[in-house]
Amino acid sequence: MVRPAEKGGGTLFAHQARAFEALGSEKKEYWSRLSSVNASTGVVHPLVHQHPLLGRNAVWLHLGMTGAVIEKIAGEDAFRLLNEDQLIELCHQYNDLLNFGLTAGYSVKYEYDANDCLFIDNLSVAHRAAPEAHSSPEIQGLRIMHRSTIKGVHHLSPGFGLPPFFDIYSPSPFGDGVWKSGGIGFRWDAQARMQN
């Protein structure tokens, strides 16, 4: 962090294995059959994955870049896309799960100081900007930070025989449902200010 904003603008971090453990058994089973498709790259990630080093199941969904969610239909060799209402509900449930972690002990809001340097494991820790981080510099103050991402050595296979990516800019291979390409993906909450 070169310069933190004068009026907040921290980052919320959540331990994704602990978040998965907080889910009920029916939701764990359902979410384990879901895979998200990145709105810009078409990369497919399982909503629930096993951490390659820790061996714990963790939940993962990018609220700002998801273009589609594919469901493996239980007991069948078939897939379908979530429709708009289902994807909105899923995103709200995931967002609520992250927020619940603030009181349940698996999420934290970190406010930056100058010269802070943080490292996180993206396979086990979710992060998102606090709402005030999207305020204008006139309201929040100017924040200057550098971010770097290290390419991982473990790929998250989507499972169920799905390919590692789809051409998100072509028509959906799954028929009806949300299939949104580009920008910040599917807008699940019109009130949520998003910037990527």
Go through each PLM region and give its residues:
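Non-heme Fe(II) oxygenase catalytic core, chiefly the N-lobe of the double-stranded beta-helix
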Residues: M1-D116, L123-N196
